[in-house]
């Protein structure tokens, strides 16, 4: 038997859960599909920036595992500078808990039905709606939000986002002794300059550390070199006793400028749409925002009698892509001038303050570029793709 909904959302990450919540609050009967049983582990550093809380309109401090304001900035696994934070920068979560919390908010609307442990096999979309097939059931809806990640079946079924830049990264969850955990209780670390185009991080969680390395470029470093850097970075940051709980590799997807993320009434959001901030590697904020925009576009289209084309893609291009494109320009500055990217914040509290405001969402890259005058306008000439 085929069941019909106002909307189907595939994926229970931030984009999907937030879209489902917004649709539910608007009174739309929504089906939320997830291929795994919840709660489920999710590959992600788990740093949720302050601007995510702003986008959600809630204080995340009570539900966060840790709230971080201080950053240790490292240069080539040698020199370091501690950047004390006057304001919180990042909330630390395990994604299994954060995503489950967002799903609970969606279910609390009373309009969202969750079916987890149900993998999508195929999707069809036309001007009248969408059909989603799983191994067990077939579902129909007026609209579909594909928020099923970088390798999800929705984009593949629709022929969307098959050509995009994929930035490689690897992370480990590390168990350490109580003394080491205490050292990291209020701070995170970033390493730059050690390997061309790459960076490392340490994010403290409630009972372990998340340690990883990533790369800004799709072709600058072979996988072996990134893996070797990861080993050196781990040994440098955690020289004492430790136990590796989990090691996993992943990629950060970047939407090519102008690439379609919509087919009829089927939309892509979050990582599925390649909405990731290249300079910081942040995806959660953009997932939340795209989920909100997707839901609002659907509600508005319905309110207008479902006439004309759904304008989700135009809204993403107007609201999110300018900042994401500017972030790629800043990432290219790091590729070419890594030393300056360490020295400027390390030596100038004012510059570090500007960076912190970008992370917090109080400023964006365009604002900072304008404040730099003629020097900032040089960024207009930088590439907007990372390949």
Predicted features by range, described:
Residues 1-15:
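Beta1/beta-strand and adjacent pyrophosphate-binding region of the FAD-binding site
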Residues 2-3, 54, 67, 72-157, ...:
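Conserved N-terminal helical subregion
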Residues 8, 12, 21-44:
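Glycine-rich FAD pyrophosphate-binding loop
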Residues 15, 38, 151:
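Conserved Rossmann-like nucleotide-cofactor binding loop
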Residues 36-73:
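N-terminal FAD cofactor-binding segment of flavoenzymes
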Residues 119-122, 138, 217-298, 302-306, ...:
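FAD/FMN-dependent oxidoreductases across multiple families
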Residues 151-227, 231:
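Conserved FAD-binding catalytic core of PHBH/FMO-like flavoproteins
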Residues 296-387:
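C-terminal helical "tail/cap" subdomain of flavin- and related membrane-associated enzymes
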